[in-house]
Amino acid sequence: MAGSGVRQAASTASTFVKPIFSRDMNEAKRRVRELYRAWYREVPNTVHQFQLDITVKMGRDKVREMFMKNAHVTDPRVVDLLVIKGKIELEETINVWKQQTHVMRFFHETEAPRPKDFLSKFYVGHDP
């Protein structure tokens, strides 16, 4: 008796998932644009404040790259989660809760993907 009620409640809860912030994808996209603009405006201040060895253009290109990395996401809840994480990163950067090494960690050269098959791992020297 109690088990069927729990099962019914679980099935009802799984069909009606409440979004985090955005009601639809258009609102989620608006939040992403706002975050992108905030990061874009903050790059010159960050470069100056942390005395980074990069230009403002390189910083803005990296911001664009980081946003384009998640351009394929279509679920509004996932987009909201990514926006929340981006706002937290922005706040930490603005308030100088990070050090220069934390900011420069974003500017490492893109790493080659790890090999998948045995021979490639052997040639590169990775453990299987």
Swiss-Prot record:
Which positions bear N-acetylalanine? 2
The UniProt keyword set, sorted, is:
Acetylation, Electron transport, Membrane, Mitochondrion, Mitochondrion inner membrane, Phosphoprotein, Respiratory chain, Transport
- Topology relative to the membrane, per the entry? Peripheral membrane protein
Q: Does the keyword Transferase apply?
A: no
Modified residue annotations for Phosphoserine: 11
GO annotation terms (biological process): mitochondrial respiratory chain complex I assembly; response to oxidative stress
Q: Where in the cell is it found?
A: Mitochondrion inner membrane
| Listed transmembrane segments | none
Cellular component GO terms held in the UniProt record: mitochondrial inner membrane; respiratory chain complex I
| Statement: the UniProt record of this protein carries the keyword S-adenosyl-L-methionine | no
Q: How does it assemble?
A: Mammalian complex I is composed of 45 different subunits.
Quote the function comment for this protein: Accessory subunit of the mitochondrial membrane respiratory chain NADH dehydrogenase (Complex I), that is believed to be not involved in catalysis. Required for proper complex I assembly. Complex I functions in the transfer of electrons from NADH to the respiratory chain. The immediate electron acceptor for the enzyme is believed to be ubiquinone.
Q: Which family, according to UniProt?
A: Belongs to the complex I LYR family.
What is the protein name stated in its UniProt record?
Answer: NADH dehydrogenase [ubiquinone] 1 alpha subcomplex subunit 6
